């Protein structure tokens, strides 16, 4: 750049003008931010949130105590104990997830042959104590009951890719 061109740009504060033009360009566009927590963006069907155990429509638990989720968990956050039932099938007596260890990888959901353990749509589960992040079977089933409609819709939307 010539000395004269540099002098003209410096004298007219060309960079200052360009910066203000860019600011004015975006000033009148619609805002990209949302007013959280009063507004919420839609979540992807593949979103990995709070864990839940699902039930069949007749109310029976889906988990067949195969322990694949426990085996595949890289963080070793899942603990399962099972007993055989009178009809010969197995059901869980204890199903615990330590959410302080969980890395939300989704391997447990992928490994489950009956879609019993899923990661639901809830992402707001901050707690005041560490003990509240140790989910037992009752808490997981309650989550499943609470989010069943959303979970079923997300699994149906994701079905072509599974």
Curated annotation (Swiss-Prot):
Determine the domain of life of the protein's source.
Answer: Bacteria
Any one GO MF term held by the record is: NADH:ubiquinone reductase (non-electrogenic) activity
Q: What class of enzyme is it?
A: translocase
What catalytic reaction does the record list?
A: a quinone + NADH + 5 H(+)(in) = a quinol + NAD(+) + 4 H(+)(out)
InterPro entries, per this entry?
4Fe4S_Fe-S-bd, 4Fe4S_Fe_S_CS, NADH_quinone_OxRdtase_chainI
- Residues bound to [4Fe-4S] cluster 2 are 73, 102, 105, 108
Name the Gene3D superfamilies on file: 3.30.70.3270
Give the way it sits in the membrane: Peripheral membrane protein
Q: Per the record's keyword annotation, is Iron included, yes or no? A: yes
Q: Which SUPFAM superfamilies does the entry mention? A: 4Fe-4S ferredoxins
Q: Does the keyword Nucleus apply?
A: no
Give the record's GO biological process terms. aerobic respiration
One GO CC annotation, please? plasma membrane
List locations, semicolon-separated: Cell inner membrane
Q: What is its EC number?
A: 7.1.1.-
Q: How is the cofactor bound?
A: Binds 2 [4Fe-4S] clusters per subunit.
Give the UniProt family note: Belongs to the complex I 23 kDa subunit family.
Summary of the function given for this chain in its UniProt record: NDH-1 shuttles electrons from NADH, via FMN and iron-sulfur (Fe-S) centers, to quinones in the respiratory chain. The immediate electron acceptor for the enzyme in this species is believed to be ubiquinone. Couples the redox reaction to proton translocation (for every two electrons transferred, four hydrogen ions are translocated across the cytoplasmic membrane), and thus conserves the redox energy in a proton gradient.
Summary of subunit composition and partner proteins: NDH-1 is composed of 14 different subunits. Subunits NuoA, H, J, K, L, M, N constitute the membrane sector of the complex.
Q: What is this protein called?
A: NADH-quinone oxidoreductase subunit I
Highest classification ranks of the organism: Bacteria, Pseudomonadati, Pseudomonadota, Alphaproteobacteria, Sphingomonadales
